[in-house]
């Protein structure tokens, strides 16, 4: 208890003030200068040169539009001879910061609403009506069960459903991809950026790009790094994947546009940098529900006025355009803050040297005696002398 009171009394009634002591020691002097040089190197090299601590920064605000071009031809028993242009394989026509290119499909033509046998699987195969439930439906059903067991073909019976008939059979994905020629389609990406804090705007179609150049150029990281037109096959290849393999079941590709701009330099130095990566990277050891697909339908009426539709299960590659970056420009406030922080860090050298001199060196008691001078309360000493 007495020890606690002594510590509390020392804390409340004692005051220490810095005392400058010049210590002639090569070790301590050299260590002090080395620490100071390291701190200066950090402040100048890292904070100001590398991180540009003298600049105010702002994040990019971006808008993106895309346009695909390319024509393909197919000739199949189901669809016959057919030409595919942009209006056929870009579904939907417009998306926000992305574009879907259909590369493969399962087409079910001339569907009408009625009753028909379900596709055979472990839940739909039956022997009699007793195996089928009226009104049954689950997430994998093509329609609503009628309770009847009907022939699917000469050897198999399945439960009948009320649905769009004939029901879709998506058991096998076409290989190779139906629109494998999409590898040579091109994609124009138009990107406008704005840094609101500095009221600076620019677009990826640079001022030196002419109309004739834009009609003929294709992006190449070495020869045409600022051409905004990309060949789809090259995008996938630059990400380290095969377009023909990806086109079968689809996937998602990221086109990354990086804008890092130093606005203390001329605006012509603010340039886009493109990179590519697959966003739905496949795990070969756990390949469940791979790729990217969805369904859409085209509705029409036959000569008798009955509604029909053609259902398409579309597989393809969705290209997501991801824009990021920051801009910096000189500002006195962050400059002074970082200068002040650097000066404060120089005090670390003094603290470190004090710890070594006063607690680690052989002559620490001698140095401690020179460093600290203990002075009694002058008023108490004076009153004691008067009482005597």
From Swiss-Prot:
Per its UniProt record, what Pfam families does this chain match?
P2X_receptor (PF00864)
- Gene encoding the protein: P2rx4
* Quaternary data: Functional P2RXs are organized as homomeric and heteromeric trimers. Functional P2XRs are organized as homomeric and heteromeric trimers. Forms heterotrimer with P2RX1. Interacts with P2RX7 (via C-terminus); this interaction is functional only in the presence of ATP. Forms heterotrimer with P2RX4; functional differences between homomeric P2RX4 and P2RX4/6 heterotrimer are minor. Interacts with AP1M2.
| GO cellular component labels | apical part of cell; lysosomal membrane; plasma membrane; postsynapse
Q: In this UniProt entry, which residues form the Extracellular topological domain(s)?
A: 55-338
What biological function has been recorded for the protein in this entry?
ATP-gated nonselective transmembrane cation channel permeable to potassium, sodium and calcium. CTP, but not GTP or UTP, functions as a weak affinity agonist for P2RX4. Activated by extracellularly released ATP, it plays multiple role in immunity and central nervous system physiology. Plays a key role in initial steps of T-cell activation and Ca(2+) microdomain formation. Also participates in basal T-cell activity without TCR/CD3 stimulation. Promotes the differentiation and activation of Th17 cells via expression of retinoic acid-related orphan receptor C/RORC.
* Annotated positions binding ATP: 67, 69, 186, 188, 293, 295, 313
> Keyword set for this entry?
ATP-binding, Cell membrane, Disulfide bond, Glycoprotein, Ion channel, Ion transport, Ligand-gated ion channel, Lysosome, Membrane, Nucleotide-binding, Receptor, Transmembrane, Transmembrane helix, Transport
Note whether Ion transport occurs among the keywords: yes
Membrane topology classification = Multi-pass membrane protein
Gene3D superfamilies recorded: atp-gated p2x4 ion channel, atp-gated p2x4 ion channel domain
Cytoplasmic side of the membrane: what ranges?
A: 1-33, 360-388
Spell out the reaction equation it catalyses: K(+)(in) = K(+)(out); Na(+)(in) = Na(+)(out); Ca(2+)(in) = Ca(2+)(out)
- List the molecular function annotations (GO) for this entry: ATP binding; ATP-gated ion channel activity; extracellularly ATP-gated monoatomic cation channel activity; ligand-gated monoatomic cation channel activity; purinergic nucleotide receptor activity
Specify which residues bind CTP according to the UniProt entry for this protein: 67, 69, 186, 293, 295, 313
Q: Where in the cell is it found?
A: Cell membrane; Lysosome membrane
Protein name per Swiss-Prot or TrEMBL:
P2X purinoceptor 4
Q: Which family does it belong to?
A: Belongs to the P2X receptor family.
> Which organism's genome codes for this protein?
Mus musculus (Mouse)
Describe the outcome of a gene knockout. Mutant T-cells show decreased Ca(2+) microdomains directly in the initial period after TCR stimulation. In macrophages, an attenuation of P2X7-induced cell death is observed correlated with altered cleavage of caspase-1/CASP1 and a decrease in IL-1beta production.
Stored InterPro entries:
P2X4_purnocptor, P2X_extracellular_dom_sf, P2X_purnocptor, P2X_RECEPTOR_CS
Do the record's keywords include Ribonucleoprotein? no
Residues bearing attached sugar chains per UniProt: 75, 110, 131, 153, 184, 199, 208
Q: What induces it?
A: By immediate ATP release following TCR stimulation.
Activity regulation, free text? Activated by ATP. pH-dependent and inhibited by acidic pH.
What processes does the entry annotate via GO biological process terms?
calcium ion transmembrane transport; calcium ion transport; cellular response to ATP; cellular response to zinc ion; excitatory postsynaptic potential; nitric oxide biosynthetic process; vasodilation
């Amino acid at each position: 208890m007495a020890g606690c009171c002594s510590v509390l009394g020392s804390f409340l009634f004692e005051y220490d003030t810095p005392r400058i002591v010049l210590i002639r020691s090569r070790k301590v002097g050299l260590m002090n200068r080395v620490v100071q040089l390291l701190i200066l190197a950090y402040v100048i090299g890292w904070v100001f040169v590398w991180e540009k601590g003298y600049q105010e920064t702002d994040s990019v605000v971006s808008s993106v539009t895309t346009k695909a071009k390319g024509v393909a031809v197919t000739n199949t028993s189901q669809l016959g001879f057919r030409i595919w242009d942009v209006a056929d394989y870009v579904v939907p026509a417009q998306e926000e910061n992305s574009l879907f290119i259909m590369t493969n499909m399962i087409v079910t033509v001339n569907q009408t609403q009625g009753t028909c046998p379900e596709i055979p699987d472990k839940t739909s195969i039956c022997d009699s009506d007793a195996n089928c439930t009226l009104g049954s439906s689950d997430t994998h059903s093509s329609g609503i069960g009628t309770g009847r067991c009907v022939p699917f073909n000469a050897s198999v019976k399945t439960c009948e459903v009320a649905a769009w008939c004939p029901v879709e059979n998506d058991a096998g994905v076409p290989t190779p991809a139906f629109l494998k020629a999409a590898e040579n389609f091109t994609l124009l990406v138009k990107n406008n950026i704005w840094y609101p804090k500095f009221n600076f705007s620019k677009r990826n179609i640079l001022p030196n790009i002419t109309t004739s150049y834009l009609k003929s150029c294709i992006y190449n990281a070495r020869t045409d790094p600022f051409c905004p037109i990309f060949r789809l096959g090259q995008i996938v290849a630059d990400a380290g994947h095969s377009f023909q393999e990806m086109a079968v079941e689809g996937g998602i590709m990221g086109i990354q546009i990086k804008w890092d701009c130093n606005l203390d330099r001329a605006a012509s130095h603010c340039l886009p940098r493109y990179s590519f990566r697959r966003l739905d990277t496949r795990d070969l050891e756990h390949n469940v529900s791979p790729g990217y697909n969805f369904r859409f339908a085209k509705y029409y009426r036959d000569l008798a006025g009955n509604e029909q539709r053609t259902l398409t299960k579309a597989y393809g590659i969705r290209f997501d355009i991801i824009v990021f970056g920051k801009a910096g420009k000189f500002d006195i406030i962050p400059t002074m803050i970082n200068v002040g922080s650097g000066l404060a860090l120089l005090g670390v050298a003094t603290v470190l040297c004090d710890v070594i001199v006063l607690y680690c060196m052989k002559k620490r008691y001698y140095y401690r005696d020179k460093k600290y001078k203990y002075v009694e309360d002058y008023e108490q000493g004076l009153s004691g002398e008067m009482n005597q």
